[in-house]
Swiss-Prot record:
Protein's name according to its UniProt entry: Dynactin-associated protein
Cytoplasmic side: 1-113
Keyword Nucleotide-binding: no
Native species: Homo sapiens
Record has Cell membrane as a keyword: yes
Membrane topology: Single-pass membrane protein
Length: 210
């Protein structure tokens, strides 16, 4: 009984493979489309797998001739496809898409880094230029000369600059006071009348009275 059960299991394992009478299958990836090149051979014996898991994982899919693309010969009646291969190919395709997206993001981020670096360099150069201009203007205002003009006794004007020795003749300090015109005229008239009264001769008439 045990031998019969094992024999039936082996027949069920390889019944799918014997139903699909195919030779060797090769899968090539070309422009996002998978092409199956299958060579029909009748004399090739079915391939046996030592492990049961590998035998169960391989399933023969019998596809009609209408569903096959033009790259496959029209005489093909069935194609044996391993689901593990298809899953592996899908994983490779998704990984390639992920790598392409990551590369695009990296390129985009690198462009942003270059733009920010250029902007920061422009700001730094502008700040340095403004600082240099401010320092130059401050030095120019510090070196500005102060001119002092002094009048001497002769009426000449002497200019004195900071950092130069003072002239030999001391300056005369002149004070000017403003007097109203009415008071000045009154003082002149009073002095004139006083002068006239003082200069008049005094005549004494002689009187002879006995």
């Amino acid at each position: 009984m045990v031998a019969d059960i094992k024999g039936n299991e082996q027949i069920e394992k390889y019944s799918w493979r014997e139903a699909c009478d195919t030779g060797s299958s090769r899968m090539d990836r070309k422009h996002g489309k998978y092409i199956l090149n299958v060579e029909h051979s009748e004399n090739q014996p079915p391939i046996t797998h030592p492990n049961d898991q590998e035998a169960h994982s391989s399933i023969c899919w019998c596809l009609p001739s209408n569903d096959i693309t033009s790259d496959v010969s029209p005489n093909l009646t069935g194609v044996c496809v391993n689901p593990g291969i298809l899953a592996h190919s899908r994983c490779l395709q998704s990984e390639s898409c992920n790598t392409q997206v990551k590369e695009y993001c990296r390129n985009d981020w690198s462009m942003w880094k270059v733009f920010l670096a250029c902007l920061l360099a422009c700001v730094i150069m502008t700040a340095i230029g403004v600082l240099i201009i401010c320092l130059v203007n401050n030095k120019g205002s510090a070196n500005s000369s102060i001119v002092i003009q002094l009048s001497t006794n002769d009426g000449e004007c002497v200019t004195v600059k900071p950092g130069t020795p003072s002239p030999a003749c001391p300056p005369t300090m002149t004070t000017t006071s403003t007097v109203p015109a009415s008071t000045a005229t009154e003082s002149t008239t009073s002095t004139a009348t006083a002068a006239t009264t003082s200069t008049e001769p005094i005549t004494v008439a002689p009187t002879d009275h006995l």
